[in-house]
């Protein structure tokens, strides 16, 4: 991984490119993220950096976390995340990673926690077909067959059934960075990204490049 940053999803809008074409974009407040720890092979067995993002009142953090930030000489933040970067040696504790680490036209992968949908049936959760609605049909949106009878005498694991939908870690690959607004720490991404407005997202260079 070459570049990575934490951000907050602000919402969606649309912009016009130089040809007058409308592009739907997601606006993300990316950073500034502060480096609070460097992991090394000698001490930790691997190389990585730990970054913090988002303001929070100090009294809402416990003493161990406050001490972790105090050791780095950084004010207490809301989110902490670790990234394995190729050039982690070039970053120092206390250094800020800002939105301009990316450029317009780059491809990125964005991870976040998807919106929770609560308990849903198989039609919405798994795009299952419904049953007949007329001619004496006894099932319409029900699950239908869940498996065979005497053999195997059970329902197989991972059978697609009703249950909780959403609220899971989700990654969307190969999204385009349309525009960077560095003075406001904003990144405009083409299309949608996981999660609700004000939700935490991770932006990193794509693995499909």
Curated annotation (Swiss-Prot):
GO terms for molecular function: rRNA binding; structural constituent of ribosome. PROSITE patterns: RIBOSOMAL_L3 (PS00474). GO terms for cellular component: cytosolic large ribosomal subunit. GO terms for biological process: translation. Pfam families: Ribosomal_L3. Residues 128-163 are annotated as: Disordered. InterPro entries: Ribosomal_uL3 (IPR000597), Ribosomal_uL3_bac/org-type (IPR019927), Ribosomal_uL3_CS (IPR019926), Transl_B-barrel_sf (IPR009000). Disulfide bonds: none annotated. Gene3D superfamilies: 3.30.160.810, Translation factors. Keywords: Ribonucleoprotein, Ribosomal protein, RNA-binding, rRNA-binding. HAMAP family: Ribosomal_uL3_B. Part of the 50S ribosomal subunit. Forms a cluster with proteins L14 and L19. One of the primary rRNA binding proteins, it binds directly near the 3'-end of the 23S rRNA, where it nucleates assembly of the 50S subunit. Belongs to the universal ribosomal protein uL3 family. NCBIfam families: L3_bact. This is Large ribosomal subunit protein uL3. It comes from Clostridium botulinum (strain 657 / Type Ba4).
């Amino acid at each position: 991984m070459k570049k990575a940053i934490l951000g907050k999803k602000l919402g969606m809008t649309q912009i016009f490119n130089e040809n007058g074409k409308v592009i739907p974009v997601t606006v993300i407040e990316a950073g500034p993220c502060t480096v609070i720890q460097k992991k090394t092979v000698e001490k930790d067995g691997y190389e990585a950096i730990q970054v913090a993002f988002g303001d929070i009142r100090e009294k809402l953090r416990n003493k161990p976390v406050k001490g972790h930030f105090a050791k780095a000489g950084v004010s207490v933040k809301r989110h902490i995340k670790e990234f394995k970067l190729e050039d982690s040696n070039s970053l120092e504790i206390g250094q800020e990673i800002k939105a301009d680490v990316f450029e317009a036209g780059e491809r990125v992968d964005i991870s976040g926690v998807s919106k929770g949908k609560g308990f849903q049936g198989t039609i919405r959760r798994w795009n299952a077909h419904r049953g007949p609605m007329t001619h004496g049909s006894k099932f319409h949106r029900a699950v239908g067959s869940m498996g065979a009878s005497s053999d195997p005498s059970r329902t197989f694991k991972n059978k697609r059934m009703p249950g909780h939908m959403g609220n899971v870690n989700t990654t969307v690959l190969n999204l385009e960075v349309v525009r960077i607004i560095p003075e406001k720490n904003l990144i405009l991404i083409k299309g949608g990204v996981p999660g609700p407005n004000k939700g935490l997202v991770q932006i990193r260079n794509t693995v499909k490049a």
